[in-house]
Amino acid sequence: NKADWRRSNVNVLIKKLHETIRAVKPWVKFGISPFGIYRNQKSDPLGSDTNGLQNYDDLYADVLLWAREGWIDYNIPQIYWEIGHKAADYETLVKWWATHSENRPLFIGQSVSNTIQHADPKNPSINQLPRKMALQRAYQTIGGSCQWYASAVVENQGRYRDALVSEYHKYPALIPVFDFMDNKAPGKVRKMKKVWTEDGY
């Protein structure tokens, strides 16, 4: 079966990357940011109630296997759609990934532009950021979110950065614990100084 052969090749690559990183720099965390749909229910009853491109079947990426085997240290699925998307609803996918984290740290990849361009279906006077943040925080298996793309946050599109600073990330956060790698607290920071690049960040 050609599809199985392709998946096997990708699996070998991910496993070898994991083993090499552990052997050379064991403190380095190796994560993946896969496409947001693992499998649709029409391909697998355990898949999500979606209708789109699939990691497993179309991209030959068995992300759940990598997490289950411990070949990746964290997972950031790219759930760039809006709440209410007909083929790939954000809420459906967040719930699906939250229940399929395979005991590895899970963060949600979130599109800044898509979030600010779509109104909250329950409150059309605001964008979807408040509801998306509430959804993520409703699951203990979700450790946070990653914003795509960074310059949209820096440029404060739709006052997105302002909302993060004043509402959702107003307090310093602890570094997520990866106790399957080690359980030692990081050492004290020494000789830290602020350095600005020509880009300003």
Which sequence ranges carry the predicted segments?
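Outer-membrane beta-barrel translocator/channel fold
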Residues: A119, Y149-Q157, K194
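Active-site clefts of carbohydrate-active enzymes
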Residues: W27-N51, I79, L93-K132
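Active-site cleft segment of glycoside hydrolase catalytic domains centered on the general acid/base Glu
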Residues: N1-L13, H85-E91, G158, A163-V165
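Pro/Thr/Ser/Gly-rich low-complexity, intrinsically disordered linker/stalk tracts
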Residues: R159-Y201
